[in-house]
């Protein structure tokens, strides 16, 4: 028994082969990948482990790496003016690539072929035999293209990995990304039936068993062609291409498609159209058109926001693109509120919440419960469209697909890495641009060569960068080779802020929104613009008093003094529980506060860099958005954006943030310290929970007792843990049931209303922090 105070014995040396809790290093790395790096849902882990158990059952495949093959085929038009030229590319990527790599539009997705599109005369176009030929040709082509992988699905193939090592690999068919029309073709079923379950086409939302290869083959044994067509929706004389490959079932491999099933399908093609039909049935054509014009006006009057597409004519345009539907989702609920029943608003809310939940980068079991709750509420509130006579029944395949998302997410993980929007953007680089560079005569061969060269260039760049061969400039490399370069630390001839080659920018409407290719940083950071606007060009103030006059804010000198008092206190602590952190210094006489009325540098914008992996972002999930505060934007009107301000609270989401509007960004030097600042006016949060109809928090402008807006000066950059700008916020007026005056435009949207919604639908990051 050691005496009290005796130091403990040193720990026994640990064996380098002691992987306690795990059998070996491979098991530890697998668990780390599942639960930390990739954060797979439990169902997906079990599914993958089941596949490994199947592979491990063959002695020849033990120890092999399983590589799921993800496919996507989608027709695209390269030119309408020259004869409606269409191509049918087939894309491939592997399931071992992380989701962030897929969504950052790097080179994980490649074109592996172009499918045939048979032509015939109008006389035979609708002939059943020709249609059957086209369908079976589609499956036969897929089988032929993938035939080279078939041997590696049973016996290991030797492949060289990125780390330079050779590994034994077993391939398998994974998710197939397809819209509904192509899912019908893939699953060999009749249109208006579900490709995943056996629910009857007249009542798709009824509970039913899932389709599978074994179930279909059993039906083939007992049913006739006509019975299978009418009672089960099966096209019995077609053979799915997956039947030629081991461990493959076409009904299990079809991935969810957020873009076509939810955004363009359930939202735009269904609910938006139903709103117009409801208004016509309820008010008649003339009054309905008047209401629709007001809805369009409300949409046009929404304030600008980085990445938010502007609808200059409302939503009344002929050709809808996927980005148009995404943009309309962000502003549509406040636009219709007051013109439609509460049940309609709640229907849209449930659908939008479903869409944003399944679009999240990380989905947990709690998220799956929220997804199921959103589906239940959607089914409950959409009944208003049936009881009002807008639609007789809801047996719609794309709406019905919402019921399968939770199951498919458990199989394949977060759907945002498998959405067809990934290949929609790839069409530009892989099909349309190569076609434009071709001679237009027998262009397909030329396009294939172009894609081959692009892939080789991308691979060469990765190799050269990994060996440090692209540092410096071409001239510096030559001088260094000749021994004529004294200083090797020369600038690079490539802009580090430029996106990698072949990467889509996906900027909407030219707004200042960009992805960041730097490493992951969980703490948000805001910085002012790099340059000060020219005094002669913008006539911005250059002193405190001049800035006070420009902003019509006589209290600015006093605000700066109180700001300096807080910053120069030796015991400066910020009370995170205060409604406004800034009011602490108002108990101090102004005479006790430092005075500064000297020079200032005024900036038109600032940029916020934060972690937002659910939105368009870089490999590390980082995103940069610009916050504007300028007297003249796009040579039209002034623009002063709203922001979320970090209050220093430990509370997650909007309860730990304040909402404010930036009047100006500026900086000044006091006692040798530069203070980057923002003048903001505040909003008060109304109520202790979001609005029950829209699901959005409500705020109103804050005023002093003398009815003057509450202005404060805060840090514009991350200096302390509180009282700093986090990221941009977007507010939408609460229009109620009043028609919007014609003189209200987006430029006065933040000045003309008494209350606003904090728009949680403006992007996925805001949805996560403002729900």
Where do the model's predicted regions map?
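N-terminal regions that are enriched for targeting/export leaders
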Residues: 1-53
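Surface-exposed beta-strand-to-loop junctions
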Residues: 22-30, 113-128, 308-312, 330, ...
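A structural/positional concept
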Residues: 42-89, 93-97
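Charged (Asp/Glu and Lys/Arg) segments that form or flank catalytic channels of large polymer-
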Residues: 55-71, 121-142, 146-334
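Terminal interaction-prone segments of large eukaryotic proteins
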Residues: 55-59, 245, 264-771
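Core residues of folded domains in eukaryotic genome-function proteins
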Residues: 65-71, 86-90, 108-111, 190, ...
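Acidic, metal-ligating active-site segments
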Residues: 78-119, 676
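Short helix/loop capping segments that flank catalytic or ligand/cofactor-binding pockets
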Residues: 79-82, 90, 100-103, 202-207, ...
